[in-house]
Structure formats: C-alpha cells, structure tokens
C-alpha cells in the first residue's frame, strides 16, 4: 500500500533502526506505551514484545486494517482516531500503570500540535520519544543564543530533560522524504513547573514574547502589559538588558520575569 501524502506518511522497515528507536524508551516492561501514528506497525512489532501494554492511535482506516490483520496480541489495543481530537488524559485513566510513555514517528505537518498536546499531560508521563524533522529536533534541543532557539525549545525544557538522540538519514524511509529526521527524547520532570503557579499561562507568556524575534524583549513585553515604563522597570529589577532579543534569555530568566510580572498588578 502506498503512503498517503496528506497524512504525512513515511515508513521505516530497517530492523536495526527500529530497535535503536525503541531502545530510547525506558526498558521497564511494566508500563503503558502509547504509539502515535504506527502506520504499518514497524515499531509496534517491537513494542508488543517488550512492554506489557501498547495502545496505538492511527488516523488512517487502511492502516488500521493492516494492523488488525498483522497483530493478534492480547497486550495491543488499536484505536482509529485523530490523536489531536483524543482526550489523552481520559484515555490514560483507563489503565493502571505507574509508568506511561509516548512514542511517535511524527507526521511532519502536525509536529507542534502533537508536542504541545504531549506536554499538556506531562505530569502523567515518564518519557516521550519522537522522530521529527532534523531541523525541528535541533530547535527543540537548542538553548539561548542559538539561531533556532524559540518558544518550543523553552516549552520542552520547562517540562522535561531534552535529549537529541541521533540522526536518521532520509534514505531510511519510503517514500524518501526531502529532509533527514532525528530522534529526540523528553524525560519528564517538574523541576521548573514547581517554580510557577500556572504553567499554561507561562507557556503562553513565552509564546507571545517570541512572536517577533526581531524585536527587543522590552518591546515584546510591552505587547503583554501595555506599559513600556513598567516593562522596563521589570527588566531592570532582574538585571535583564532591555536591548536583548527573545533568543538571548534562558529559561530561568523567563521564569523570573513571568513571576515578577504576574505577581504585580500590571
């Protein structure tokens, strides 16, 4: 069966690569694995061997039929659905597992949506392993003063320890995509989350500050509080130069700035 371009389907079949990807997961057998976009089941085949429970979410009815014909495992559940429309928290609540991880050969066209959906339930997860476009993987794992550093980099760092695992050459897929991919892992923790009262508001705060990377942090902060003098006062309090641009602040500075702004009556 041919890959469907509108679903962003690119398949892998190399057994060594499959094992290497699955190896990135925590290898504790007693856990729930949620696989997003299993396609023809290349990763699924290895996952059902290693873990107690595997739930796969596949939007394509044709792929679901292939999966049902290929697998007859009592530890596998196949769900046909658009993952962006599923309540993952409700899905997870059906199972009694302390360790829960997500793995996905992520369709390029919905990468950000899947990442942010995963981050929203980070408190329920142990780890997530994603195959992404190499450029996006580098962005997620980047730090301040790096060209591709943005609000997605900070969001992933806020909820997890980010690791750039390895590059996957585009020739390992069929059909061959235009760019190389990479595997990243997110190991979830609450180190930064404990430092603020509203994580969703923080993520939105950072997103707005990155809306225009060419403007200074002062101008972008002014877009939020609508008071340039007050914005300058906040930055001076934290010894943050008003001439810096969004990519020149690290996550600790963003957390301090958020806490200062939202504990004041701006």
From Swiss-Prot:
Q: Which reaction does it catalyse?
A: adenosine(1518)/adenosine(1519) in 16S rRNA + 4 S-adenosyl-L-methionine = N(6)-dimethyladenosine(1518)/N(6)-dimethyladenosine(1519) in 16S rRNA + 4 S-adenosyl-L-homocysteine + 4 H(+)
What CDD domains does this protein map onto?
Answer: AdoMet_MTases
Q: Major place of localization?
A: cytoplasm
PROSITE patterns for this protein = RRNA_A_DIMETH, SAM_RNA_A_N6_MT
What EC designation does it have? 2.1.1.182
Which Pfam families does the entry mention? RrnaAD
Question: PANTHER family of this UniProt entry?
Answer: DIMETHYLADENOSINE TRANSFERASE (PTHR11727), DIMETHYLADENOSINE TRANSFERASE-RELATED (PTHR11727:SF7)
- What task does this protein carry out? Specifically dimethylates two adjacent adenosines (A1518 and A1519) in the loop of a conserved hairpin near the 3'-end of 16S rRNA in the 30S particle. May play a critical role in biogenesis of 30S subunits.
The family database entries (NCBIfam families) matched by this protein are listed as: ksgA
Q: What is this protein called?
A: Ribosomal RNA small subunit methyltransferase A
Which organism is this entry from? Answer: Mycoplasma mycoides subsp. mycoides SC (strain CCUG 32753 / NCTC 10114 / PG1)
Q: List the taxonomic lineage.
A: Bacteria, Bacillati, Mycoplasmatota, Mollicutes, Mycoplasmataceae
**Gene responsible for this protein:** rsmA
